[in-house]
Design a protein with these regions (language model features):
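Catalytic glycan-binding domains that act on GlcNAc-containing polysaccharides
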Residues: 323, 359, 396-398, 419, ...
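"A position-specific structural signal for the A-helix of alpha-solenoid helical repeats
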Residues: 51, 88, 125, 153-157, ...
Length: 752
């Protein structure tokens, strides 16, 4: 009896405690939200506040900023962002050489806010400030007890900041010798290259390797050659020298060095890649027998390695170069069986398909298209349908062509593939699709009347908007389908909120409650104009929080104003997942407010006038920009293409010679410069191709005008979708598909 009473009592206490905690959370959240709900109340009304102090800091007026930050710290204002106030007060003091004051503030932040996102930065900068205050105690610091990441940070910052070359040299040596940091190696190479020659051999080899990895091949070759000549680290130096020669195009020298390295079976460190790169090198020297021999050695010694599918892809390519389809097919079927999901298996299959088609081998072409269809049962299935349709068209197999044409018209949601099919379709086919549309619309209405919204949406998703895709104009079925879809979506809270025109303070109150006030810091920082830190704080919350409309609303504001448009597109690209819309490939069915978030337009003030000047549709420019960079002005590719339209520096420099531009300095991260020069380059491509073929221009933009002219010569411009289908570079083929699909959406969702 006593135990029973005790259990009941404990249970009631637990329930009471939980209820009380929930009430406290709700009340404090509501109170917190109410206190700072409106923008005019969310920040301090005082003339001196975080925003005014931060503006002074950003303008380089560090002493004034320090005074304002410290004044704010002594008031009750902006307590939610007090850690930021302390941090920037410390940073302002550091930049004014007020080292003790900065150290005290960094220490205060670390003591009061151990869980702040600024804590590790405070720890770093406190150590750096102490290093400066104590006049660069290099030996004591690097031999001290600080953690490795602290030493690396302090060393790199001090190396960048000091004007004393002796101190810089000593710091660089510590960073290079202890941690192997590339910036230290590059510093030595650029400022004291003769010092590297006097390094001990172990450090010399480390430095040479770092320089090689950083792209300083010529400098690293000199040091590897020294080590090779002096019989120190000879095996590894031989390998690296071979790679440098190979990358610089000295293939015969590279072959001799690879042979020397591989001839000694005790050389294990780089044998795996040595075999692979040596085989590739001999392949490019057209010594196919030696290349195959080395590839086979690799397969024998490393049968389960990740490079095996690459090698089979190379075998297929080698066989195709000899027009030997039989041998190529043997390798292809082998790799398809052993590595069915590998990207290199797919590359081998597509290479085989293109070669069989060019050789007019119908049987093998159909073998490959069938394999491609099996590889894409759902995702990009219309890509495989397109190959089947166009190859059948080329071979004159009308029945087969029409089969895949109808499959495309009935199932694809890509304007690119549908317009390609429409270019070959007849009126009877289109009429059949319209009959299908009528049936599915009636079924959708029936399910809607029964409140079976899931099934109704499934039927709507089967409707094909052929007239809209072909002309950009909605017919009755399209309008009805989209209206019904909107009615269904309006049952979701996210969609309701978007159309409710709720006030910003109301959205903030709900979001503050949803996140237990965690979002408040990011919102305050945003309203003070501290967009970068607002983004950092907000994105952490976004990643771990269920996406409601209030969260999405503030994400749009903060991500856009902080310049993180790429991140905004990433969270908007499949916006339907936030309100239960599972058909991410069917953007047409969504209401305009959502379609335009999937395909947004940024930088209108630059795009529209420049596009009109060159008589290019703005929609095409937006499509290029979206697929090149996701509207990220600072984007940089692995080959060096930069900015919104991913211009190569040489291309940009050529366009910048026009009297219309001549930017000085040329800055490809500047949106205006990048867009203007990119649109100018598009104008040149349209002019040089002498065709209004958007597919050909997109392909030329990606792969170069020379290849564009070759494709034009091979396939003409009468049907640009035919041209796009037979582009024989994998990356460009997919690039064109994405760009033209985006162009079709932009041209329909926006009317200039």
């Amino acid at each position: 009896m006593k135990n029973t009473i005790l259990k009941i009592f404990n249970k009631r206490v637990l329930i009471f405690t939980l209820c009380f905690e929930i009430i406290v959370i709700v009340m404090t959240s509501m109170l917190g939200a109410q206190d700072i709900s409106l923008q005019k109340n969310i920040i301090s009304k005082n003339k001196i506040n975080y925003g005014t102090a931060l503006e002074l800091h950003n303008r380089g007026k560090y002493l004034e900023a320090y005074n304002q930050f410290t004044n704010i710290m002594n008031t009750e204002d902006d307590m939610i962002i007090r850690d930021y106030t302390i941090y920037y007060g410390a940073k302002s003091a550091l930049l004014t050489n007020m080292y003790n004051e900065a150290i005290d503030l960094y220490a205060l932040l670390m003591k009061e806010y151990p869980r702040s996102s600024l804590y590790p930065y405070a720890e770093q900068y406190k150590a750096l400030t102490e290093f400066y205050r104590d006049d660069y105690p290099i030996s004591n610091f690097f031999n001290g007890k600080s953690q490795k990441w602290i030493k690396e940070f302090v060393g790199i910052r001090a190396l960048r900041d000091t004007d004393d070359t002796n101190k810089a040299r000593m710091i660089a040596y510590e960073l290079l010798n202890r941690f192997g940091l590339s910036e230290a190696a590059i510093y030595y190479n650029n400022n004291f290259p003769e010092d590297i020659s006097s390094f001990p051999n172990n450090l010399k080899f480390k430095t040479a390797t770092i320089l090689y990895e950083a792209g300083y091949r010529k400098a690293s070759l000199k040091h590897f050659q020294y080590l090779y000549d002096n019989n120190a680290y000879k095996a590894s130096s031989t390998y690296y020298m071979a790679r440098i020669k190979q990358k610089s195009g000295d293939r015969r020298d590279a072959a001799a060095l690879f042979d020397e390295y591989l001839s000694n079976l005790n050389n294990k460190s780089h044998r795996r890649l040595g075999l692979y790169y040596s085989a590739d090198n001999y392949n490019r020297l057209k010594n196919y027998e030696k290349s195959i021999e080395l590839y086979n050695t690799f397969l024998k010694e490393y049968p389960r390695d990740d490079y095996v599918p690459r090698i089979y892809n190379s075998f297929v390519t080698l066989s195709l170069n000899r027009n030997n389809l039989v041998q190529a097919k043997t390798y292809l079927t082998n790799v398809m069986k052993r590595f069915p999901k590998s990207r290199y298996t797919e590359l081998a299959l597509k290479s085989y398909l293109r070669k069989a088609f060019k050789l007019n081998n119908k049987t093998e072409t159909y073998f490959a298209t069938k394999a491609l269809e099996a590889r894409y049962p759902s995702f990009r299935h219309d890509f495989a349908l397109s190959w089947n349709m166009w190859t059948a068209e080329e071979f004159g197999d009308i029945e087969k062509r029409d089969e895949y044409l109808m499959k495309t018209l009935l199932t694809s949601k890509s304007h690119y593939f549908i317009k390609g099919a429409l270019s070959l379709a007849n009126n009877e086919m289109i009429a059949n699709v319209q009959l299908s549309n009528t049936y599915y619309l009636n079924e959708a209405k029936r399910y809607y009347a029964d409140s079976n919204f899931t099934k109704s949406m499934q039927m709507l998703n089967k409707i094909q908007f052929l007239n809209y895709i072909a002309t950009g104009k909605e017919d009755n079925i399209t309008r009805e389908a989209r209206a019904l879809a909107k009615n269904i979506l309006m049952h979701n809270r996210f969609v309701k909120d978007l159309y409710a025109n709720r006030s910003e303070d109301d959205l903030f109150n709900e979001l503050s409650l949803q996140t237990r006030r965690e979002v408040n810091k990011a919102i305050i920082l945003y309203y003070y104009g501290d967009y970068d830190n607002a983004y950092t704080e907000f994105d952490k919350i976004f990643k771990k929080t269920q996406v409601t409309y209030p969260l999405f609303y503030f994400a749009e504001k903060i991500f856009k104003d902080s310049g993180n448009t790429k991140r905004l597109i990433q969270v908007s690209a499949n916006i339907g997942k936030y309100f239960g819309y599972p058909y991410s490939d069917n953007v047409d069915l969504l209401p305009d407010e959502f379609r335009k978030r999937v395909y947004p337009r940024y930088f209108d003030e630059y795009v529209v006038p420049e596009a009109k000047y060159y008589k290019i549709e703005p929609a095409f420019v937006y499509a290029i920009m979206r697929e090149e960079s996701l509207f990220d002005p600072k984007a940089k590719s692995w080959v060096g293409a930069m900015g919104l339209m991913q211009l190569m520096p040489t291309t940009a420099a050529a366009e910048n010679k026009k009297a219309r531009y001549r930017y000085n300095p040329l800055d490809l991260t500047d949106p205006k410069q990048n867009i203007n020069l990119g649109v100018s380059h598009l104008g040149w491509l349209f002019s040089s191709q002498k065709a209004s073929n958007y597919i050909l221009v997109a392909a030329s933009y990606n792969a170069g005008s020379g290849r564009g002219r070759r494709w034009k010569a091979e396939y003409g411009t009468n049907n640009m979708y035919r041209t796009g289908r037979f582009i024989d570079i994998e990356e460009t083929e997919y690039y064109v598909e994405r760009v033209i699909k985006s162009y079709e959406y932009y041209s329909k969702y926006y009317k200039d």
